[in-house]
Amino acid sequence: MTEQEIKDLVTRQRSYFQSGATLPVSARLAALRRLYNAISSHEKEIRRALQKDLGKSGFESYMCETGMVLEEISYMLKHTPKFAREQRVHTPLAQFCSRSYKKPSPYGVTLIMSPWNYPFMLTLSPLADALAAGNTAVVKPSAYSPYTSEVLLRILAECFEPQYVAVVTGGRAENTCLLREHFDYIFFTGSQAVGKEVMRSAAEHLTPVTLELGGKSPCIVDQTADIRLAARRIVFGKYLNCGQTCVAPDYVYCHRSVKDQLIKEVQKQIRRQYGKQPLHSSDYGKIINEKHFDRILGLIDEKKVVHGGGSDRSTLRIEPTVMDNVTFSDAVMQEEIFGPVMPILVFDSLDEVIRRINSMPHPLALYIFTSDKKAARKATARCGFGGGCINDTIIHLATSEMGFGGFGESGMGAYHGKTGFDTFTHYKSIVDKKTWIDLPMRYQPYRKGDEKLVRFFLK
């Protein structure tokens, strides 16, 4: 799409939004139903596209992508009528004879920029929230997942006219053109580097943004943890989608006394979940492209590998890999791994862990495996992070009743469920004043006794 075509598209969407067509709750629900039905009817195509782009199995495609989108749409279909109501609030005595309320109002024309690692879910979940809130949307999927982008284009073109929801495909040139336009809200999921560019561009128009970024999410395992269960759940969260998950445990921070036991259990769980030859497993995905394949291999120190380490360039697969005796100065600890490599570091005290984590950029997630409730409370209270789990990994993002988002360097804003509706909503504060009485004390010239009345009301 050319720069002029993008300009025209944004203009058409703004005109459509200003017509009021997206405001009725009935229109929002109809849009969500169309989207739900289209996804259901195209499920086989979605599965094939995700298999081609990322090697995802059918089960994983539904569990982590299609099913999560359908669940989010279902949640919005159920709750949007309630969310969209005016919210009555208390009126202070100084505003005598008034009715005060907050009016949920859509921002207008929104831009949703999604990544390649969960290209279906991370496009359509925020879109469902935006539509429920009454916005129009321009959707820009990643160029790195072309098969899924093509399916998204077909599904959304089938459901919506472009003045309501439109898909812009392409790469950096299209991204640049889009970010020059004046949107009313921008929702971006991706890397920190690109997130900064999005925020700089948004600042030109003072456009509010949600940035869902990433970071090095720690997974703490203390000496009281159920090591066998911890290993099972860590392996699941770490190697899901070949480690290409923004909330995957980036590294394991293990108490020195249980490290060897944890490594043995992790090795067992990798064999149990992915088999003796994971490079040939139909359930194990692949790295998105050769550039990322080479980047991940460059982080592996062969001398520190205690499991895995093998790869197949022809299929872009890297074995689930575990590294021991890792320090914070190793290459694997200098950037977000975003791949199937698990470094294991050791600690001697929880205070040491908290100091170290807080000395680093705020991660998107934090996980702690422990039987000590005080330790869990201390870690989750004292460390800065977006969200997380106690005695599990990654599942916190699958709960519509909780918002999901980053903190500090891992992003800003959140979505899912009511939080997602609120993200795409501006709450107008309105006072509806009665006309049959008008207290004179606020008007000049001020008279003796007016200040006493003001002091009575305002204290």
Residue ranges and their predicted role:
Residues 220, 271, 317-459:
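Conserved C-terminal structural/oligomerization subdomain of aldehyde/semialdehyde dehydrogenase
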Residues 3-6, 25, 43, 227, ...:
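Residues at or immediately preceding the N-termini of alpha-helices
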Residues 17, 21, 36-39, 43, ...:
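Structural signal for hydrophobic packing residues in well-ordered secondary-structure cores
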Residues 93-229:
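Rossmann-like NAD(P) dinucleotide-binding subdomain of oxidoreductase/dehydrogenase enzymes
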Residues 28, 73, 134, 165, ...:
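Residue-level signal for inorganic ion chemistry
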Residues 1-101:
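N-terminal Rossmann-like NAD(P)+-binding subdomain of aldehyde/semialdehyde dehydrogenases
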